[in-house]
Amino acid sequence: METYKGIQFFSNKGTVKNAFKKSNLGYEVMLDRKEDENFIYSNYEHVETQVEKDSKGMVVCKKYKNTYEILVEKVKEKRLGVLLVGIGGNNATTMLGGICANAKDLSYMNKCDLKRSNYLGSVFLSSNIRLGYNEKDKEHAYAPIYKLIDIYNPENIVYGGWDINNMNLKDCLVRNKVFDNEVIEKIKDDLDYVPLKSVYFKGNFIAGNQQRRVNNILYGKNKLEILEQVREQIRNFKKQNNLNELIVLWSGNTEKNIPHIPGVNDTFLNILHACKKNHESVSPSVIYALAAILENSPFINSSPQNTLVSAVVQLAQQKGIFIIGNDLKTGQTKIKNFLLDFYFGTGLKPKSIVSYNHLGNNDGKNLSSDLQFYSKKVSKSNLICDYVRANENLYVDDEKDTNVLVKKSIDYCEGDSLNEKGKVSADIEDDCTYVESLEKQKVNSEIVIKYVPYVGDDKKAIDEYISEIFMNGKNTIVLYNICQDSMLASPILIDLILLVELSQRVFFKPNQEKKTNEDEHLLNENIQIEDYKLSHTILKPKYSSFKNLDSVLFLSSLFCKSPFNSTVYKTRHSFFSQLESLWNFVRIISGLPIDAHIDLPYMI
């Protein structure tokens, strides 16, 4: 029988406050805002440019304004839980081990020095945001985000989760080989936890080399029955741990990508029928996403696959539940992200970006399979495509054949030396088509990932960037990056959890309302799937005149390789735009004006 008691790092610390605080900072920030014991109140006027093309091809720019009343709930006594899919994996155990070490304020010796636990790499817990300018001292003033607004303490969250393998988490710490032995010895008893039974379907969703890990799975007649079992697990965990809110986070293996299939995964009704019929396209991650949303729990996809199909998005939007994806932006892609900002921002023209990396953890093992690697490759490549579309003027001349010495031969022999009249085979046609597609790329982009067991979690990455510079010169930058993959990923998982929790406490009242779709509230609390009635609850708005953020939480784009777009907005891929968007969001909800980076009063 499964146990639903979660992991609680705060149980040995006595009474603790849910809002994150750091005791070694000897100051507080006093903000010019209205607040009481329950809420922070602020107002914000948003000004943006709306762009349209008229019938003559003219780009018309119009200024648009809207004012918002903002209501932010304080954390207070809320109990939050997080269920991780793939809880025994490197990322999940590293995140939990790090939070545990911080909760215990752990110090330990590595081979170089005495070290203390920290949250380095977390935007919410370690980075500083600009407050304004101190004219007297002629200094810009900065403070951590948690000094401006309540950020939930990750050490106070109740954790649990699923895994296809039943190994206890304290043994997973040893198997995954991320932490030093001294750290493992000091935290392993706090991670004494056996994962819940998980969902596993054959059909190449994950690599075949993972089959030998499978010994801890749910069984059912069809995928709808298994979906209902996962929902029951979520309810039981929430009830036994006395939780007010719960977040489900996919930290499992990369799955293969699933195509958009009309009639199957285009609407929530169709995908529920597809579950009943055991349709081959319904993956384990889709089961968890549907289960989380039906249980009114936000869902985070930290892996590359396209779990957030149209059906999942529609269900989330009709229920008003946050969804986040896809794939964590950790080392190589994060560097690529801000390097592309540098290239395009300074008028340079990237032409070739080749990325190679090898690693030896279970992520690398799973990605050694072609189907799973393809999901990763697509996720890593989306970044470049959006930058090129935003800077098409740099590539106009590339569409012309500027090299007059090279001409493509139209008249060629389809046979060979033995058969002059032969026909070109399908394999040759495919090969030619593939090569021609590479030759047509505005930026040649290639990604290679190899599994090398010996290196373990220490991923080695090599990147070569070639760009065109002034008067057709060339510039080449080569980077060699060695990083502990899971230690880069773990603070990003923490940030995604904290962002979702914060977003659930923020409400907006716009002066001008958007038009809503007529079918926005067609969802019933009882859904008939053939002979089965699926029941769920629909949350009512907390405050009648205030609204939550859209279900597709694109503020998370800073943390995701392939950030998901909503039905009305396409996310910007610029690293600094994403970072400033998140920081400005924090500013306006805490009562500060946005930082426009112009400092005009000091220019005049």
Curated annotation (Swiss-Prot):
Listed GO CC annotations: cytoplasm
GO biological process per UniProt: inositol biosynthetic process; phospholipid biosynthetic process
Record-linked InterPro entries: Myo-inos-1-P_Synthase, Myo-inos-1-P_Synthase_GAPDH, NAD(P)-bd_dom_sf
Pfam families to which the protein is assigned, alphabetical: Inos-1-P_synth, NAD_binding_5
Catalytic function, reaction form: D-glucose 6-phosphate = 1D-myo-inositol 3-phosphate
Functional pathway: Polyol metabolism; myo-inositol biosynthesis; myo-inositol from D-glucose 6-phosphate: step 1/2
Listed cofactors: NAD(+)
Binding site for NAD(+): 88-91, 163, 198-199, 210, 213, 251-254, 303, 327-328, 330, 361-363, 376, 456-457, 485-486
Lineage top rank: taxon: Eukaryota
Enzyme Commission number, as recorded: 5.5.1.4
Keywords on record: Inositol biosynthesis, Isomerase, Lipid biosynthesis, Lipid metabolism, NAD, Phospholipid biosynthesis, Phospholipid metabolism
Entry-linked Gene3D superfamilies: NAD(P)-binding Rossmann-like Domain (3.40.50.720)
GO function terms (MF aspect): inositol-3-phosphate synthase activity
Membership in a protein family: Belongs to the myo-inositol 1-phosphate synthase family.
Function: Key enzyme in myo-inositol biosynthesis pathway that catalyzes the conversion of glucose 6-phosphate to 1-myo-inositol 1-phosphate in a NAD-dependent manner. Rate-limiting enzyme in the synthesis of all inositol-containing compounds. De novo-synthesized myo-inositol is essential for incorporation into GPI (glycosylphosphatidylinositol) glycolipids during intra-erythrocytic development.
Protein name: Inositol-3-phosphate synthase 1
Lineage, top ranks: Eukaryota, Sar, Alveolata, Apicomplexa, Aconoidasida
